[in-house]
Amino acid sequence: MLLKEIIREELEEDYYNYYNNLGEYSTGKGDDIKEITNNSQNKTNNNNNITILTSYNYNNNNNNNNNNNNNNNNNNNNNNNNNNNNNNNNNNNNNLFVSHSSILRSSSSPSSSESDEYSNGNNNNNSIINDLSSSSSSSSSSSSSSSSSITSPSSNHAYSPYNRSHKGIKISPNNKQVSSSGLLGSTMVSTSLIMGASNINNNNNNNNNNNNNNNNNNNNNNNNNNNNNNINIINNSNTNNNSSNSNNTINTFNFNNNLNNLNSINNNLNNYSNNMNINNQHNHQFNHYNNNNNNNNNNNNNNSDNNNIHFSNNGNMNIYNPNLSNFNNNNNNNNNNNNNNNNNNNNSNINNNNNNNKQIGNIVAKDDAEQLKESWKKIKEISNEFIKLSKLATKSDLQSIDLIPELRSKVMDLNNFLHVIEEKGELLKTDERQQKKRMESDKNAEKREKRREASRLLNNVCRNCKTTETPEWRKGPDGTKSLCNACGLHYAKNVKREAAGLHHLNEVGKKVDLTSILN
């Protein structure tokens, strides 16, 4: 125990000297650093005399988060607790841990034999536990909570387990206090903290989602070096929520947490058991790859239920993001519109096919009409040949006997053409073009008939030809409607010639001889 205390003091001094010499942040804005204490946010558990401060910083940047861990990852995390314990001391990213009296353990914490490496067995000491949850979005937070826990049995301050290369942690030279921030459900234990910035993000690409067995090993790596993140906390950059309209800003010096949220979380921490089994299993159902597939493939129309974001800490916190469901609803609407467009296109194709059928029908009708004309022409030719043959037969009785086979062949051809005309005639009865022609001819016939009836009612007679029926009565020498149509046109032409000087009229205005004009 004495050796452990000596090592602890040396490590504490080393930590303090290093972070004290670290100076300002990389931004060069040392004057803007604020030391903030959250004594009002402390929550005491009387059963263990352990002061626990929890603060949550919600970041809904959900596009490519490592939040798609299924319950299978939880089982893998339980199987990989030994690897996590080894990774706590031997991490490729040089994570420094100080482990002393009591360790804040999760529901899947290692056994007592395994925890002897990190704990001195003093679980009843008054201590302050700083649980920096390394994985806020993966389901392996149960193992990472124990791996990232730092206890100090005799001091009132906690040290950060972050990499030395990380410049987002500031230690006050006066109070020797280390501050750090966690994302999405990470618990923090401290009585006086500087709310410095720690570049903690678990927004891994979807490639990390497939590494189920390596999620525990990647948790601490994500705490220190997350190259896949575009969030620069040191520069006070904002992380915009791509799946909602809210602007989730991660500030370097200020947390975006309301006291009401902290109080509700502290109330939830009262329900923890005496063994300090904290269940930080976050069932993050972030199926954003399904959202991307909805953008690329219009066939995924049933992913709207998977877009509810559930942040669960012992099943007491549920956050619903409605914009994701709206996003998928829009995709579904787009898909429906695409389907409607396809239906419209199909309907247009059907209409085009119908038009083509109509055109084909017109072509067939036209061919039938032409075939009828050809057949009638052939019949006319055959009839002319009959006349010729009959003339030859009348000249010589002997030759008529030789013409009988030729006449029979012509009769057979005539019968064939007659059958064709009968068949095509039935088809032409349903042809619209032929019906229109018949209707027009019928209308013209009706007009002509009406004119004839009108002329009969007048009882008029042409003065030249003595006809009583004419399509139109014309002006003559005896006045209007004195000549028929043909006589009236001839009379008008002669009058124009007389006016031109061919036949000069008398100046007295004698009547012109009707016979001379008409002739």
From Swiss-Prot:
A zinc finger (GATA-type) spans 462-487. The keyword Zinc applies. Pfam families: GATA (PF00320). Residues 429-461 form a coiled coil. One of its GO terms (biological process) is regulation of transcription by RNA polymerase II. Residues 37-156, 273-357 have a biased composition (Low complexity). Keywords: Coiled coil, Metal-binding, Zinc, Zinc-finger. SUPFAM superfamilies: Glucocorticoid receptor-like (DNA-binding domain) (SSF57716). One of its GO terms (molecular function) is transcription cis-regulatory region binding. SMART domains: ZnF_GATA. GO terms for cellular component: nucleus. Residues 25-182, 198-249, 273-359, 431-453 are annotated as: Disordered. Residues 172-182 have a biased composition (Polar residues). PANTHER family: GATA TRANSCRIPTION FACTOR 22-RELATED (PTHR47255), GATA ZINC FINGER DOMAIN-CONTAINING PROTEIN 12 (PTHR47255:SF4). This is GATA zinc finger domain-containing protein 8. It comes from Dictyostelium discoideum. The gene is gtaH.
